[in-house]
Amino acid sequence: QDNIPIFRYHVAFDFEDNTDFIEWYANVMYRSYYTSDIPCSINDEYLTLSTCSTEIYDSRFVVVARKLRDGEDASQYTYYSNPDARKPAAFYKAYGMKVPDDKGPDYDYYKDILSKMEGNEN
């Protein structure tokens, strides 16, 4: 059993308020294998693709993308691997690794990141 709540990414859409958006964004970034400096806001449009994963039993591989804004060029951003991507407890156990002892994403940390993004009204 994991010590953090299950991220219900499949029910996240039409955020009620900025708090809901920050919670969703923090969970996405906390689990991301790859990350970038692409600015994100509650007003952007997002696409979520989810498929079966063979890493561990009954798991999913999820891709989240943000629609380009008018006049935006995706090549202006930097993309990199995230060595700290949080995986489900079952992943660590399946590969004989210690399950991280954390409480989930640090919402204040991700809220601060969002507030520093250029053109972000969060």
Task: State the predicted function of each range.
Residues 1-122:
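Extracytoplasmic/periplasmic soluble domains downstream of a signal peptide or transmembrane helix
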